[in-house]
């Protein structure tokens, strides 16, 4: 007796379902399945649940100029900026760092490059593309790094290479 098409279709569907169950067991171990889907970047929190917000560390307020680690690195913000208004209507940073106010405030003036447009034309005011300071400049906090860092600045590399221009003797 020859099996009908409906029996063949039913067997194919059963085979697909069994394969899907086997794949689920392989890719989603029992603990992950028990609490829902898990994403490695979120830690143990299931995707459907809201993770606990990370701890906010206090911002340093040292007012010191930090060494820059690479060419063209923007300087860091050495003081607290909590509560500063920085929007299209007002830039609190410019209250102290505008070139016209630095004699009075003793703050470091904004670089002349911040007054240039993308074609290097000098403007009377800060360029709109440089207006939002925290796009490049960030306050610092004394925290443990989330991941390891083995960055070495170019001066250290040059000192290591024997015979290199400027290498230590």
From Swiss-Prot:
Name assigned to this protein: Periplasmic nitrate reductase, electron transfer subunit
Sequence similarity: Belongs to the NapB family.
Positions contributing to heme c 2 binding: 114, 133, 136-137
UniProt-listed InterPro entries: Multihaem_cyt_sf, NapB
Organism: Cupriavidus necator (strain ATCC 17699 / DSM 428 / KCTC 22496 / NCIMB 10442 / H16 / Stanier 337) (Ralstonia eutropha)
GO cellular component terms attached to this protein's record: periplasmic space
Gene, per the UniProt record: napB
GO BP field: anaerobic respiration
Induction: Expressed independently of nitrate induction and anaerobiosis.
